[in-house]
């Protein structure tokens, strides 16, 4: 049976931009890296408003409507996301990576406005209970190893998001509510520093993306040309890996400018969050010997602690990496 789903007004970027630890490992020429990542966002109903205060989620969705305080009820959302990433070493210093996501989202709404006009009711109907699932947008990364020493490993490159997601009609114009069927181009630099201590790594990743113009549907059901705000991300992580055990933490900050076409006034966004990860695998043994199939499995938890115009949504993640 053919099913039609509506893309929710999501308030966090999907794909790997907000995924857990962005650890860069060298990929020799003609070597494949396969990573499978499962992300689970439990049900949440809170958000940071334009003043950085925690408010009900519907206050964020209806931020530009004066009647939002008259709406009663609750809006709940949750998400499951499965990503497959395949990277290939083109040469000793160049690599290419593609990430294909499968997404399932559920929205539960009991929103009600007793004296709503017909146009206001259309907006509330756009936030009704529903479930949508299907493929997400594919992302491609082309990168080059900039410098490699015993203490430093630096990589830079370009990222491309392709509008391949077809799980529903993109809807909503919050700056970071881009949903599926969206495209962008960006660049990143990742600096890894290895102190003179076995298994310890520090990393800083700087990334920026230019969001391209596409078509969307407003909450009123009108199709418009739309561009999400351009964004910048900063990651800092610290980790230790010894005797096949991995542990680390990462701080992430992102900022996104106001959306464009047709609205965008006062909806700039930022978010601060912290992640913790623990893992097991034989990657640390590569320092002593060659392995037929290097691998690692990690479990992570991410929690936001400050933000503006973005949901308060914790995430759990399970990832596995293999080289062959």
Positions of predicted regions on the chain:
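Outer-membrane beta-barrel biogenesis signature
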Residues: 18-62, 285-291
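Transmembrane beta-barrel strands of outer-membrane/channel proteins
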Residues: 34-42, 98-102, 156-162, 204-210, ...
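Short loop/turn motifs that connect adjacent beta-strands in outer-membrane beta-barrel proteins
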Residues: 21-32, 93, 147-154, 196-202, ...
């Amino acid at each position: 049976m053919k099913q039609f789903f509506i893309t929710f007004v999501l308030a966090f970027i999907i794909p790997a931009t907000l995924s857990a630890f962005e650890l860069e490992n060298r990929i020799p020429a003609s070597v494949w890296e396969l990573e499978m990542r499962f992300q689970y966002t439990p049900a949440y109903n809170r958000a940071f408003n334009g003043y950085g205060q925690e408010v009900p989620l519907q206050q964020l969705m209806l931020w530009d409507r004066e009647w939002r305080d008259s709406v009663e009820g609750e809006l709940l959302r949750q998400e499951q996301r499965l990503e497959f990433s395949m990277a290939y070493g083109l040469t000793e210093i160049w690599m290419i990576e593609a990430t294909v996501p499968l997404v399932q989202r559920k929205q539960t709404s009991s929103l009600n406005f007793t004296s709503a006009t017909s146009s206001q009711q259309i907006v509330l109907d756009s936030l009704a209970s529903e479930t949508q699932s299907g493929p997400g947008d594919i992302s491609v990364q082309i990168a080059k190893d900039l410098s490699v020493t015993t203490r430093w490993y630096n990589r830079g490159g370009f990222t491309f998001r392709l509008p391949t997601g077809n799980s529903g009609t993109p809807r909503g114009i919050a700056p970071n509510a881009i949903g599926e069927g969206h495209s962008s181009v960006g660049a990143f630099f990742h600096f890894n520093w290895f102190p003179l201590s076995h298994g310890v790594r520090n990393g800083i990743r700087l990334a920026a993306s230019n969001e391209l113009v596409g078509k969307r549907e407003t909450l009123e059901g009108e199709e418009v040309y739309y561009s999400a705000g351009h964004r910048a991300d900063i990651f800092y992580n610290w980790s230790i890996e010894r005797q096949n055990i991995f542990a680390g933490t990462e701080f992430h900050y992102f900022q996104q400018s106001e959306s464009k076409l047709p609205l965008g006034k006062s909806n700039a966004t930022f978010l601060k969050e912290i992640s913790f990860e623990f893992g097991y695998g034989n990657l640390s043994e590569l320092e002593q010997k060659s392995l037929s199939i290097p691998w690692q499995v990690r479990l992570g938890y991410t929690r936001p602690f400050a933000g503006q115009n973005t949901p308060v949504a914790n995430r759990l993640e399970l990832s596995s990496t293999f080289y062959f």
